[in-house]
Amino acid sequence: MPASYSSLWVHLIWSTKNREPVLTPSLKHEVFIVINNIATDHEIYLDCINGVADHVHLLIRLLTDQAVADVVKTIKGNSWEFFKNDPDRYVSWQDGFAAFSVSPGNLKQVRSYIYNQERHHKDKSFSDELKDIKQSTKS
């Protein structure tokens, strides 16, 4: 058995630069593949990812030697680096992010929420979504 163990699940959210709706369906698919590859290369356990035109959601599990801010910096920085020189696929991220801890008992619910982003955003803006999530996580 390893000397250290963690079961730290985090729901991450960040937006595109200036919340521009640049993530078209085809580009979104490419971005998610790139993010998945970055996560794999950096030993970041990415459980699921989805989003809409102006922001993304990820569910990750942190290892004992990982910090949320470092994981986000790695994924955002490397994905921007990958796309920065291609004007047809340019993606830039807004500074900052939101991170919410997820208990193991709520993983299924959070996965469903992430997978159903398109449906959630038919009637709700990103700002309203973030307010609702913040409100639901208050004790």
Regions found by a protein language model. Give the residues of each.
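Basic nucleic-acid-binding interfaces
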Residues: 1-139
